[in-house]
Amino acid sequence: MLSKDGCELMPGVYDALGARLLAANDFQCAFMSGYGVAASRLGDPDVGLADLTAMTDAGTAVCRAAGAMPVVGDGDAGFGGVANVRRTVLAYHAAGFAAVSIEDQIFPKRCAFSDGMQVVSRAEAVARVAAAVDARDEIRARGGDFMIVARTDARLASDGGGGAFEEAMWRCAAFEDLGADVVYFEGPDGEREMEAFNARVATPFTMLAQVEKPGRKLLTPTECANLGYDAVLHGLTLLSASVRGVNAAIEAMKEGNRAVGDELLTPFDALYEAIGFEEHYALEEKFSPAKYAAYEPPPRGR
């Protein structure tokens, strides 16, 4: 899914059309975010309302539309205890994901940057990731290919039990030792912590999550690679752009415009192509019944 050649840009996606557009533009991987699914599928904030069924239903469509592009699924806090974590890993693999991200928030979880976010104890965090790795190994034993992305939100936690860089580093080291394929922590405070993280973690791959949030500097993939990262996640960029675009079109319609200005719209032919009509027509033509009207199977001797 990831290579060691530079830093892979991993956009966040929340529906099948977004996955299709990313794949058409030759992105190498994507991340289906719980934040995006909760917003687009439920119309709700990311406060634990998108359950396992909602996520795997959305994920099945996203992974199908993504084609050969690997997609990491946001497994949140595993939707319960360790048995739920195991079930989540197996369900995400069955849905077509290449990997699942499991974090150490309490359940039900919420957006890492929201008020009142808390993490579980060290012991519970370790048990959760151990259960995820065990389920991954079960998949691999059956010939499947799957990865575990282990995340800690301890750097941003508000409960006093994990709101520090050193606590986040302890958890990342533990997740690494348990066999997670990728580890990362939310909310690094500047490049000094980013560089220190990569100096202390030895997993094959590390990831940085970036959010377009006031007061936070966004780094380019090249800058991330120079700090030691293998992937940079932009989980909310496409959702944020979509909300802005839809709101602009809505405002234009509210002003009495029956037709929204072209500057806000995708040209019809381009929309037609992006959704895949031409591919569908080519498939219908390739297997047109008219081509088989005179078909007869060859005689078979006994």
Segments from the language model and where they lie:
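Alpha/beta enzyme core
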Residues: M1-Q210, P214-H234, A241, N247-E251, ...
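Flexible C-terminal active-site loop/helix
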Residues: G256-R302
